[in-house]
Amino acid sequence: METTTIDIQALKKELVLDLIQIGALKFGRFTLKSGIVSPFYVDLRIIGPKMLRQFSVLLYHVMTVKGLTNMEKRVICGVPYSALTFSSCMSMTYDLPMVICRKERKQYGTGNMVEGIYTKNETNCILIEDVITSGASIVETAEKLENEGLLVTDALVFLTREQLPLTNGMHILKKGEKVYNVHPCLTMTEVTQVLLDEGKMSQEQREDILQFIGTNTFSETKTTAVPQKKKELTFTERAELTNNEFSKKLFKLMEEKQTNLCVAADITSKDDLLKLADETGPEICMLKTHIDTLDDQPDEQFTQQLKELAKKHNFLIFEDRKLADIGQVVKQQYARGPFKIAQWSDLCNSHLVSGGSATVKALKESLKEENITEPRGLLLIAQMSTEGATTGESTKQEALKVALENPDFVSGFICQSKLRDDLDQFLYCTPGVRLDVKGDSLGQQYNSPEYVVCEKKCDVIIVGRGIYHDKERQNAAKLYRKLGWEAYQKRIQQ
């Protein structure tokens, strides 16, 4: 069977779709041997003769492309036991000499660990594997073969879960001074792309799978399945990941000022709001306002005073407007009307109920129409801190989708936990932070700074009544600043 006459990409596509059809590739929630819960599961033991022959074509194609067919004195060996059918099919189809490696030496018969014909210290052995996760079984088999005098440097694998680093299209496994090159035929990135293109998978499903892969990796030097913990980046490092000017500004401000505290000024007096801003300004990275709840009508003089306090104490202004109407209306609410939010507020937020993409487009247009050039950002409301909130999984997924489509303007999310571990370019801002109580009579639920920052991996703690109801507001702000920043320091050092 000549691979040169076969469309390899078409064959890959056919195999992916067939794997789904027969149930060899499943999506859902599966607990692996390591204890990790995976969004997909692969079982190639159920494939039939036709697919086995097609697998052999792909494996031999990679073997040829990588120059392994040019090796002198070579044999192949399937990693016991699931890959033995692969190596047997390749051996018969392409006339390749084959050996069999046992998992353990038998105490009867020949007692050989390796069965087959080879010359010690001369014969090269190419390993064949079905699926690779950590690479432990490949290294273990290679060591057994080497102990019997075979030379092992390379392995072919049908599918990689991509939980090992890929270098020039291959995995590099190390054990001591030994190095093994693993050449995959197919990656989960390719698999999910085929399923997306064929309408068998949504973009959100694909992103969840790729996120899982990115956050559940294994060290290339390990031979046991020990997941690598993702390095927690500093705010300074995360500022380099984004082209969003507001996000850059806030990340850098938090690091320089050493505060991730936002005070929620949910009060009804202009004078009291300005007083609170002046009292707590030295301790905060942002001041959150509700301009439409003030009893005395705010005017341009008031917003100018607020901007001057922000400049004096080096904090940013966040208007908690929760825009939710159709595009044309939110344009007016944001840039015009009695409040002219875009003129003085660095950051605003929005629900997704009227269509997140349309809302973002309208807000960006309003900035352009009003000729506002200062950095402006938007937080999408993905999760809320009130009991019974209807912001469920679909809201979260829509928020992620809109944010990824508009990274220049969407700075992050209002949320109760970090939405995706691999999206460090976004800000995760959490209301409902308080130390002394767990909730109120209207359904608000509170969490501690350490829980929000360390456990839930959020960035900005938003504190309202815990500060503005305190008789010593400045001291309360100092305390929350200290606790929030200590939690951040603890997180990045873990």
Curated annotation (Swiss-Prot):
A GO BP entry: UMP biosynthetic process
Pfam families, alphabetized: OMPdecase (PF00215)
Active-site annotation: K322
Keywords linked to the UniProt accession: Decarboxylase, Glycosyltransferase, Lyase, Multifunctional enzyme, Pyrimidine biosynthesis, Transferase
Keyword Acyltransferase attributed: no
EC number from the UniProt entry: 2.4.2.10, 4.1.1.23
Binding site for UMP: D266, K288, T289, H290, D325, S385, Q444, Q445, Y446, G464, R465
InterPro entries hit by this protein: Aldolase_TIM (IPR013785), OMPdecase (IPR014732), OMPdeCOase_dom (IPR001754), OPRT (IPR023031), PRibTrfase_dom (IPR000836), PRTase-like (IPR029057), RibuloseP-bd_barrel (IPR011060)
Known pathway: Pyrimidine metabolism; UMP biosynthesis via de novo pathway; UMP from orotate: step 1/2; Pyrimidine metabolism; UMP biosynthesis via de novo pathway; UMP from orotate: step 2/2
Similarity section: In the N-terminal section; belongs to the purine/pyrimidine phosphoribosyltransferase family. In the C-terminal section; belongs to the OMP decarboxylase family.
Function according to Swiss-Prot or TrEMBL: Bifunctional enzyme catalyzing the last two steps of de novo pyrimidine biosynthesis, orotate phosphoribosyltransferase (OPRT), which converts orotate to orotidine-5'-monophosphate (OMP), and orotidine-5'-monophosphate decarboxylase (ODC), the terminal enzymatic reaction that decarboxylates OMP to uridine monophosphate (UMP).
Protein name as annotated: Uridine 5'-monophosphate synthase
